[in-house]
Amino acid sequence: MREALRSLLVALQFLTRLPVRLSAMPTPEQFGRAVLCYPLVGVLIGVVLYAAARSLDGTPPLLQAALLLSLWVALSGALHLDGLADMADAWVGGLGDRERTLAIMKDPRSGPVAVVVLVLVLLLKFSALAALLGQGEAGLLPLAPWLARSSLPLLFLTTPYARPGGLGQAIAEHLPARSLPWVLGGSFGLALAFGLAGLLALLVTLMLFAWLRSRFLARLGGTTGDTAGALVELTECAVLVALAL
């Protein structure tokens, strides 16, 4: 039980900006085991967003959507948005070359492509949030962060790590591969408790995952921390839009 709690705390510290403080730096093995808790972190983010949405009942939907999106970004510290920005720049600037793409991803500067992609993704999220809130469907909000963070263990389990060294490789090398399929099956299966909306969100998540993974493999031969972050952001966006349509 103590080890499970520590894994959750490691996952929360890594994926969110919640005030989680550990007594010591996690080991690579602990970072690897923490991947089991990524779906739960998504659930917790979703619960916070739902609670915030309910507390803002009566607020105009556009303002409510803007406040919720701001909270959403703050909860993750824009961690995944940073990965999306890096991947967008690298995918265009890399011109199809693996080494050039990886080099651009390491550049901390953001180019115009990154800015445009971030604006478009945030605009789509905002619009979808406003639509869902206007339809009285705030209860569906947890599906987006939940399924997006459930896709991370699936990515690490099925896709080699493309860049040697770093935290990403340590996580990939210490994945609890025997336990992950059960956790993923349970996480994806529980999404069906949301009925047809859950089924739609799950199908969108899996189809987008399959397509993005194929692009990662074709360009890089694997995944990186940036592409994993992009997967989270694009999955959240796609699920929200699908539910709002």
From Swiss-Prot:
Reaction catalysed by this enzyme: alpha-ribazole + adenosylcob(III)inamide-GDP = adenosylcob(III)alamin + GMP + H(+); alpha-ribazole 5'-phosphate + adenosylcob(III)inamide-GDP = adenosylcob(III)alamin 5'-phosphate + GMP + H(+)
A Pfam family that the UniProt record links to this protein: CobS
InterPro entries tied to this protein: CobS (IPR003805)
One cellular-component annotation, GO: plasma membrane
Membrane topology per record: Multi-pass membrane protein
Location of this chain's protein in the cell: Cell inner membrane
Keywords, comma-separated and alphabetical: Cell inner membrane, Cell membrane, Cobalamin biosynthesis, Magnesium, Membrane, Transferase, Transmembrane, Transmembrane helix
HAMAP family listed in its UniProt record: CobS
Family as reported in the entry's similarity comment: Belongs to the CobS family.
Identification of the protein by name: Adenosylcobinamide-GDP ribazoletransferase
Lineage start: Bacteria, Pseudomonadati, Pseudomonadota, Gammaproteobacteria, Pseudomonadales
